[in-house]
């Protein structure tokens, strides 16, 4: 039986707390760019007729809904997240959409995905992998439930390489973002966000971690001058 670590429980509690303002703050703090990043990531998925797609760390369901909008009605989508509050809000969004019959959401951690081996054509995770305490275990679980020939698509924040832009980015991320986020939600949560991004490995280091659990043909695509990166790999 999988049990979250103390750090994992604190991160889970943090997301439960900020869930009601999560979507609003994502739009404000990213100036709305996060939507285009998600669309780019979803374009990278692979699926078959009557296929199945898993969205890990689904949050309030933005990526799951984007997948539903861009795939045939025969494709089913499952979203999982370790935050019960996030999943509850996601279920409400899905129920209010035209894709309610295609998207199922449930509470589950990335490190212990409750599905059989070789279950999904593609797996997505957006802005979630850096919050997985045992990152290698999370990647192993995604690899396990991915079908042979299937693709994982990982969207995550990254640190820009262009020096001047990197300094501006760090100023906004470290100084401005926590203050703005704290006005509407929990300050500590929006202090955690930039810290977790800065601590995340480089693109090449993360691709090496993906390859280490078995993913092949690992690639990355930098978005918006390197603020975000999409990683892909295949089984």
Curated annotation (Swiss-Prot):
<dbReference type="GO" id="GO:0008425">
    <property type="term" value="F:2-methoxy-6-polyprenyl-1,4-benzoquinol methyltransferase activity"/>
</dbReference>
<feature type="binding site">
    <location>
        <position position="81"/>
    </location>
    <ligand>
        <name>S-adenosyl-L-methionine</name>
    </ligand>
</feature>
<dbReference type="InterPro" id="IPR023576">
    <property type="entry name" value="UbiE/COQ5_MeTrFase_CS"/>
</dbReference>
<feature type="binding site">
    <location>
        <position position="60"/>
    </location>
    <ligand>
        <name>S-adenosyl-L-methionine</name>
    </ligand>
</feature>
<comment type="pathway">
    <text>Cofactor biosynthesis; ubiquinone biosynthesis.</text>
</comment>
<dbReference type="GO" id="GO:0043770">
    <property type="term" value="F:demethylmenaquinone methyltransferase activity"/>
</dbReference>
<comment type="similarity">
    <text>Belongs to the class I-like SAM-binding methyltransferase superfamily. MenG/UbiE family.</text>
</comment>
<dbReference type="Pfam" id="PF01209">
    <property type="entry name" value="Ubie_methyltran"/>
</dbReference>
<dbReference type="InterPro" id="IPR004033">
    <property type="entry name" value="UbiE/COQ5_MeTrFase"/>
</dbReference>
<dbReference type="InterPro" id="IPR029063">
    <property type="entry name" value="SAM-dependent_MTases_sf"/>
</dbReference>
<keyword id="KW-0831">Ubiquinone biosynthesis</keyword>
<comment type="function">
    <text>Methyltransferase required for the conversion of demethylmenaquinol (DMKH2) to menaquinol (MKH2) and the conversion of 2-polyprenyl-6-methoxy-1,4-benzoquinol (DDMQH2) to 2-polyprenyl-3-methyl-6-methoxy-1,4-benzoquinol (DMQH2).</text>
</comment>
<keyword id="KW-0949">S-adenosyl-L-methionine</keyword>
<dbReference type="GO" id="GO:0009234">
    <property type="term" value="P:menaquinone biosynthetic process"/>
</dbReference>
<keyword id="KW-0474">Menaquinone biosynthesis</keyword>
<dbReference type="GO" id="GO:0032259">
    <property type="term" value="P:methylation"/>
</dbReference>
<keyword id="KW-0808">Transferase</keyword>
<protein>
    <recommendedName>
        <fullName>Ubiquinone/menaquinone biosynthesis C-methyltransferase UbiE</fullName>
        <ecNumber>2.1.1.163</ecNumber>
        <ecNumber>2.1.1.201</ecNumber>
    </recommendedName>
</protein>
<keyword id="KW-0489">Methyltransferase</keyword>
<comment type="pathway">
    <text>Quinol/quinone metabolism; menaquinone biosynthesis; menaquinol from 1,4-dihydroxy-2-naphthoate: step 2/2.</text>
</comment>
């Amino acid at each position: 039986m999988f049990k979250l670590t103390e750090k994992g429980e604190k991160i889970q509690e943090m997301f439960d707390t900020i869930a009601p303002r999560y979507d609003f703050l994502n739009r404000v703090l990213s100036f709305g760019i996060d939507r285009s990043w998600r669309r780019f990531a979803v374009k990278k998925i692979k699926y078959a007729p009557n296929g199945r797609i898993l969205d890990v760390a689904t949050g309030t369901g933005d990526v799951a809904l984007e997948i539903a909008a861009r795939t045939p009605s025969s494709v089913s989508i499952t979203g999982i997240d370790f935050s019960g509050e996030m999943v509850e809000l996601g279920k409400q969004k899905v129920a209010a959409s035209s894709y309610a019959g295609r998207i199922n959401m449930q509470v589950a951690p990335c490190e212990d995905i409750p599905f059989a081996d070789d279950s999904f054509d593609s797996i997505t995770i957006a802005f979630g992998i850096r919050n997985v305490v045992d990152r290698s275990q999370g990647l192993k679980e995604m690899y396990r439930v991915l079908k042979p020939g299937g693709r994982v698509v990982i969207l995550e924040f990254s640190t820009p390489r262009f020096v001047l832009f990197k300094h501006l980015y760090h100023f906004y991320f470290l100084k401005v973002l926590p203050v703005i986020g704290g006005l509407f939600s929990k300050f500590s949560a929006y202090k955690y966000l930039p810290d977790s991004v800065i601590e995340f490995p480089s693109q090449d280091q993360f691709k090496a971690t993906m390859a280490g659990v078995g993913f092949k043909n690992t690639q990355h695509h930098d978005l918006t001058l390197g603020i975000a990166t999409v990683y892909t790999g295949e089984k």
